[in-house]
């Protein structure tokens, strides 16, 4: 019985993730159909990962801040062709938004009244 409960939770996790991902893409389909670097994505983070190397670019602060997620994304996107890098950035950004929705719907937030 415990195996079924765990399997159901995993299925629910992926189902909620897929639905929220699709909803975010339907809201702005150009994120997938016409991907492009946005703001610092290409000018700083991808450029630093490409020229300085993935590890050095991650520990290099940008304007006094460590932009960890963005720089790790840039470092991972080096494994892809250049034309795939912007869509990779967009998929990671949409996924992070999906995880926020999933967190708000999780049992950890059950003590808070999110909806009236």
Where are these regions (language model features)?
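Transmembrane-helix motifs of polytopic, lipid-linked glycan transferases
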Residues: 91-115
């Amino acid at each position: 019985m415990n195996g079924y409960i765990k399997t159901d939770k995993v299925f629910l996790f992926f189902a909620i993730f897929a639905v929220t991902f699709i909803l975010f893409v339907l809201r702005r389909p150009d994120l997938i159909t016409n991907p492009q670097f946005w703001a610092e994505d290409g000018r700083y983070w991808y450029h630093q990962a490409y020229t300085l190397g993935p590890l050095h670019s991650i520990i290099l602060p940008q304007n006094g801040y460590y932009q960890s997620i963005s720089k790790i994304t840039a470092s991972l996107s080096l494994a892809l062709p250049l034309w795939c890098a912007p869509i990779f950035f967009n998929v990671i950004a949409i996924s992070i938004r999906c995880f926020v929705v999933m967190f708000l719907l999780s049992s950890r937030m059950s003590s808070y009244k999110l909806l009236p």
